[in-house]
Amino acid sequence: MRHRHGLRKLNRTSSHRLAMLRNMSNSLIEHEVIKTTLPKAKELRKVVEPLITLGKKPSLANRRLAFNRLRDRDSVAKLFDVLGPRFANRPGGYLRILKFGFRVGDNAPMALVELLDRPEVDETENVQEAE
């Protein structure tokens, strides 16, 4: 019986799955929005939301726990210095998963994963940076 197994295998070995979710977590924390398949997005939520909850309580022990899961100093610094204070008053639900159509090659359902309360970027700023 398959009772109470709350993990998608995603057709990967456990080490590959761990590395993939770690890389996706780092990308999401760095860029604050990523595009991926829907099952990966749902698994990513289970990884990132507890990390942001850790970032709300800045202590050395929490930083070490976050570094143990992310293995990237820049991501841990952003988690505790930017994202923790941003979500200080929110009791959970830090991510938004938007369905994004289907991938051209294999028709896999795609999703856009983004952090809530992202600072808005004006289009004029992007044009000025490009020039």
From Swiss-Prot:
A Pfam family assignment: Ribosomal_L17
Gene Ontology biological-process entries: translation
Listed InterPro entries: Ribosomal_bL17, Ribosomal_bL17_CS, Ribosomal_bL17_sf
Entry's Gene Ontology molecular function annotations: structural constituent of ribosome
GO cellular component, one term: cytosolic large ribosomal subunit
Alphabetical UniProt keywords: Ribonucleoprotein, Ribosomal protein
Top-level lineage group: Bacteria
Gene3D superfamilies in the record: Ribosomal protein L17
Entry similarity comment: Belongs to the bacterial ribosomal protein bL17 family.
PANTHER family, per the entry: LARGE RIBOSOMAL SUBUNIT PROTEIN BL17M, RIBOSOMAL PROTEIN L17
UniProt subunit comment: Part of the 50S ribosomal subunit. Contacts protein L32.
NCBIfam families from the UniProt entry: L17 (TIGR00059)
Name of the featured protein: Large ribosomal subunit protein bL17
Species of provenance: Burkholderia multivorans (strain ATCC 17616 / 249)
Gene name as annotated: rplQ
